[in-house]
């Protein structure tokens, strides 16, 4: 299983970024600071995706690439307490809990302390 996490600064908004991601051949990609995955579905051809964020151009996308149809994603909670720390159930070839993270300062806490508080 290959998992890639990438803060790609404003999503996969260029063919260069799409190509670089696909060259890594991930089964699952966590894309921080991302456009909504619908915007790049034709370019990376993911099988399914979860996305969190208030803006359509700035969020956290978690995608199963269509090269690997071995995994399914589902949120473990109805409402995420910390917007950028998302617990996900991954099922399929292997079953596990994935905590997708895009750390940001919140309420005066540093990146690390936000993650620590969420966990």
Model-identified regions with their sequence ranges:
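N-terminal, active-site-proximal structural segment of metallo-dependent hydrolase catalytic domains
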Residues: 1-44, 51, 56
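A conditional alpha-helix N-cap/helix-loop micro-motif detector
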Residues: 10-11, 78-79, 112
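Active-site-adjacent loop/helix micro-motif of nuclease/hydrolase catalytic cores
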Residues: 13-15, 108-111
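Short, low-complexity, polar/charged sequence segments that are solvent-exposed and flexible
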Residues: 22-26, 50, 82-83, 117-119
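Structured beta-strand-rich core segments of catalytic domains in phosphoester-bond hydrolases
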Residues: 34-106
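A long, amphipathic alpha-helix that forms part
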Residues: 109-119
């Amino acid at each position: 299983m290959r998992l890639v996490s990438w803060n790609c600064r404003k999503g996969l908004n260029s063919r260069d970024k799409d190509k670089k991601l696909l060259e890594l051949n991930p089964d699952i990609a966590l894309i921080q600071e991302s456009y909504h995955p619908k915007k790049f579905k034709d370019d990376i051809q993911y099988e399914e995706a979860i996305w969190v964020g208030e803006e359509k151009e700035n969020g956290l996308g978690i995608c199963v690439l269509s090269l690997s149809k071995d995994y399914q994603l589902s949120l473990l909670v109805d409402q995420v307490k910390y917007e950028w720390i998302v617990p996900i159930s991954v099922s399929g070839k292997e079953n596990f809990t994935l905590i997708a993270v895009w750390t940001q300062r919140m309420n005066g806490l540093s990146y690390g302390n936000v993650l620590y508080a969420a966990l």
